[in-house]
Amino acid sequence: MPLILQSAEESNRAYASRLEASFIDKNSKKMNIDLRDAVSRNFGFGDFIFINPRTMEEVARVHNLKELQNVIFSVPAESLQYHIIRNHVSRWLYSRAIFPVAEFLKQIRWEGLQDIDAHRKIIFEAIVKYRKMKNQGVVAVFQRDRFDRYSHFARIGDGSLGGKGRGLAFIDNMVKRHPEFSEFENASVVIPKTVVLCTDIFDEFMDTNLLYQLALSDADDDTILRAFLKAKLPDRLVEDFFAFFDVVKAPIAIRSSSLLEDSHYQPFAGIYSTYMIPYLEDKYEMLRMLSDAIKGVYASVYYRDSKAYMQATSNVIDQEKMAVILQEVVGTQYGDRYYPAISGVARSINYYPINDETAEEGTVSLALGLGKYIVDGGLTLRVCPYHPDKVLQTSEMEIALRETQTRFYALDLKNNGHNFSLDDGFNLLKLTVKDAENDGALDYIASTYDPYDMVIRDGIYPAAVS
């Protein structure tokens, strides 16, 4: 327990020194300032300052949990040992109400372990575990100095997340509440890294650039898109985007999330645009592509098909607002193209149950490559999660050969977006399954038809039909 000794007698400073207590001179004109500094320094408030125990000089300073995580392996051993013996780390965490980590580290005594490298690892892993736990299921405000690979979901702005954004936040929260999702070996159940530009950013963009008059007019889609592309996004977003690029280091999907989207009785799937951009080392080129994609999603609210759908569903177009989801694209790079081994679309209601299936059990449509193939109505593998061994397409040889997927979508990593257009798939490649076989992407997801034995075998085999 840190001590503070207050006295009007200067001679008592020696007693304070022997007790390793802070001394406050009551006769000092700045007594209140000295007291505040002593409390901040000894009770864990303020920055955590690592000191050299021999010289008492500062060797490192951290402002928050992320910075402590970053420096824990570089702090000199004698300094870290000095603070561990005195429980300074746990005290600092207590003062910030980070109780789980503080309680855990307080129990790890130097006398019991006496291994500085082990202490470093324990502190680091405790912080990482806590930050992962806190970040899941929470829509935190995006802070560029704190967003890192342990962050999952954040928002920029104070408006609505939109329908799709709310759905993703709900799923993230559900994953956090069900630890059984972490029980699968070599499988991590998480949503991709996500940042949502809330609807107030959309409002600011529309108002600042005076776009409403054109957007609500009868102008054609291309005219609306070109006007939106010429408009400017708020300058303050630039540094946030750069911070997001530094963490994700992967292609990014720019997805619509309007107020009305994903409502239960009025699905908006395929109405608004979704763009993808490749990851580039040149941040400014990525910024240009990302800005164009965000503006393209905003513009899609006012395309003719969108207005017609709004009218058909008895909604008012000038009341619609758009949030935008920036999301890491999960997949693997194969040369100049990028795609996942499997994409899926899950439906909570099975409208056409077969045999033992029930409507409440839902269905999943699975396909090779990007999910656009599924949304566009391509041939997919339909599976009921409750009956994974009973798949209609594999029940008979003729059906399996007739209804198997033959093409798929991949992101063209060479396309830098200079041909940006109304078609949100302008930089996607439509490839054959043979291309995926050459990439080695089918090894664990495909079966092969053997025409000699008239059977389907798991895996890929030469001189056969996949």
Q: Which residues are covered by each model-predicted region?
A:
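A structural-propensity feature for long, helix-poor, extended segments
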Residues: I191-F242, Y309, K321
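Amphipathic alpha-helical packing elements
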Residues: S79-E111, P192-C198, S263-L280
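Hydrophobic/aromatic residues positioned on beta-strands within the core alpha/beta folds
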Residues: I4-Q6, K26
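Eukaryotic low-complexity, mixed-charge intrinsically disordered interaction/regulatory segments enriched
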Residues: D47-R54, A60-F99, F104
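Receiver (REC) domain switch/output surface
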Residues: R18-L19, D34-F45
